[in-house]
A protein has these predicted regions:
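Small-residue-rich segments of transmembrane alpha-helices in multi-pass membrane proteins
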Residues: 53-70, 110-115, 173-190
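Extended hydrophobic alpha-helices typical of membrane-associated regions
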Residues: 140-194
Length: 194
């Protein structure tokens, strides 16, 4: 049933992409690239050191697709922020399932770094996204951006401080997820997709 649902969703995504990109080939290409990248995760990249690549490419394609559909050019900082968000999300997403994944033979890059390494990489990537979303758009940073950046740093530091012990590692994970939520709020509230 899961495969049928995935196939149906892929067909729907391709239909939307085809309709949206009928007169603009870049829209079509970005949609196909994002979908193809996402599908490449399960095979062959999930258990390799390249496991973050599909996340980075697909997350970068999503805001690019939205901006292209609206008829605008896509700023490089937005593509980079999307890619880093996907990269960081992959490392964070693996942490809760790490033991189960390793038991089934999944050994992507985050698994090879271990839970602490994966959380550190995720935190670094997500803080880079925060900086890109604050300083990437033209003009001076908005007050909301500065406040969101401060919140991201505080949430991450709190999560790291409380999560120093392996028994409380879930707090470090929650801190990383908190920064990801701040980044999504920055992206939307900053009007980057408008």
């Amino acid at each position: 049933m899961r495969r049928i649902l995935a196939a149906a969703m892929a067909c729907l995504a391709l239909a939307v992409a085809t309709a949206a990109g009928a007169d603009r080939p870049w829209v079509f290409l970005v949609a196909w690239l994002g979908l193809g990248s996402a599908l490449s995760y399960d095979w062959p990249l999930k258990s390799t050191v390249l496991s973050p690549l599909p996340y980075a490419v697909s997350f970068a394609c999503l805001p690019a697709f939205v901006v292209l559909v609206a008829g605008h050019s896509v700023p490089a900082w937005l593509v980079l922020a999307g890619g880093l968000l996907g990269f960081g999300a992959h490392f964070a997403n693996v942490v809760p399932d790490m033991a189960d994944d390793e038991a089934t033979g999944v050994r992507g890059l985050p698994h090879r770094l271990g839970a602490d390494g994966a959380l550190a990489v995720s935190a670094g990537a997500l803080l880079a996204v925060t900086a890109l979303l604050i300083f990437g758009p033209p003009g001076p940073p908005r007050a909301f951006g500065a406040a969101a950046g401060a919140v991201a740093v505080v949430v991450l530091l709190l999560g790291a401080f409380v999560g120093r012990r392996s028994a409380a590692r879930h707090w470090a994970f929650r801190g990383v997820i908190g920064v990801a939520l701040v980044d999504v709020a920055l992206l939307i509230a900053g009007g980057a997709l408008q």
